[in-house]
Amino acid sequence: MKKYIFIILSTLLITACNTNNNRQYVIGVSQCSEDIWRDKLNNELVMSTYQHDNATLKFASANDNDKLQTEQINQFIKEGVDLLIVSPNQIHTISSVIDKAYDKGIPVILFDRKTDSKKYTAFIGADNYEVGHEMGHFIAQQLKGEGRIAEISGLKGSSPAIERNRGFMDALKAFPGIKVVSRRYADWLKQKGEDEMDSIITRDMPISYVFAQNDRMAIGALQATEKHKIKGIKIVGIDALPVPGGGMESVRDGRLEASYIYPTRGDLVMQLALNILEKRPYKRDNYLKGALVTRDNANVLLMQNEEMNKQTARLTNLHGKVDTYLAQYNHQKVYIFLFSIITLLLIGIMVYVYRTIVIRRRIEEEATNAKLQFFTNISHELRTPLTLIADPVEYIINDKNLNPQQRNMLQIVERNVAVLSQLVSEILDFRKVQNG
C-alpha cells in the first residue's frame, strides 16, 4: 500500500510541477530615450510576449543620457539577464559597457542604432543611409534639381544622425543645382527643432525645403515658420508615426510635405532574440524596410493603422481574459492537487489505523488464548491432585474402624477438597465468559 501511495504522490507532483518545460528567459531592453516611436516599439515587444510566453522583458530608458544608460546596462549585467536589446545613445560613449556585456557571454542585439564596436550579436533596424538617400532624392525631384535646403539633424554623434546625413548628401551629389545652406543639430527634440529653425530663418534665408531627421523636429520647424508667418518653405521628416499629431497625420493634413516610415517591428526584434537564445539560425545584420509617405498614401495608411489598432486592442483584451482564465485554472490545479494529497493521506491513515486494529486484535486473541491455555493447564494440574485426594478420603471415611476424631479430620479434608474443586471450576467458567 505504501508503495502505491508513493507512486500516486510522485505522479501528482510531476504533473503539478511540469506545467511548462520551456526555459524562461529574461531580456533587458535599454532605450536611449523616451518618445512616441520608442513607446510603439516597447508595446510591440510586449505584444510579442503574448505569443512567446517564455520571455520576460525588463525596460530601462536613459532619457538621452549616456552615463545613465551605462549605469542601466551595468545593472542588467549585474542582474544576469539572458539577452540585451540596446539602442545606444551615441556611437562612442556606450561602446565600452556593451563590450563588457558581450565579453561576459550575454548576447547583445543593437536596435535602431549602432556603436563603433563589432562586439554585438546582431543588429536590427532600418537602413538609415537608405532613409536619408530616399529623402534627398525626393526633395531633389520636388525642386527639379535646383534650390536651397536646410537640414536639421538629430543628436550629434548618434549613428542615425550620421548615416541619414550621409545618405542625404550622397543623393544630392547628382543635383549640383541644389545647395545645403545650413545643417543644425536639434537632438531629436521638437522644441530644439523650433529653436534651430528660428536661427535658420534669421540667418540662412531664403530656403525652399527643410529636411528634419525626425517628425518631432519637423513639426518644431513648422511651428517656427508659422510663428514668423513665413510661407512657401516645405518641410519633410522621418518616422511617419500614425498617432494623433504625428508625422503621418501632419502629411495627410498638408502641414508636412512628406515623411518616411521608420519601422519598429518589435515582433521581429523579439523573434531575433529568441532565435539567438534558443540556438536557432539568424542573420547578424537585419535591415527593416520603410516607405515614403506623401499626401497620396497617408490617408490609406492611417485607415490601415486604425484597423490594426482595433485588432490590437481586441488581442490585448483577449490576452487579459486568457491570463485571468489561466490564473483561475492554475489555482484550481493547486486546489485539486492539495485535495488529492489530503485524500491520499486520509486513505493512508485509515489503512494504517485498520492494520493497527487488526494487529492489536490478533495480539489480544493470542494473549487470550494463552491465558485460557494457562488456566486450562492449571485447572488440570489442580484437579488431578484434588481428585487423587478426594477418592481415597471418601474411601477411608467409610471405614468403620475409624474413631470419631479421625473421621472428623477426614471430613474436614473432604470439604476443603470440594471447596478447592468448586473454586477451580468457577475460575475456568469466569475466563470462558470473559473471553466470549
Residue locations for each model-derived region?
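An alpha-beta-alpha
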Residues: 27, 31, 45, 133-178, ...
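Heptad-repeat alpha-helical coiled-coil signal-transmission segments
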Residues: 325, 329-332, 336, 346, ...
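Hydrophobic alpha-helical segments within soluble ligand-binding/sensing domains
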Residues: 69, 124-149, 192-194, 218, ...
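Primarily the dimerization/phosphotransfer
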Residues: 359-400, 408, 412, 418, ...
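Hydrophobic heptad positions in the DHp
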Residues: 417-420, 424-425
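Flexible loop/hinge segments that line or gate small-molecule binding clefts
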Residues: 91-130, 141, 148, 154, ...
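Hydrophobic alpha-helical
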Residues: 83-102, 168, 182, 186-246, ...
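Hinge/cleft segment of the Venus flytrap/periplasmic-binding protein
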Residues: 17, 156, 171-172, 268-341
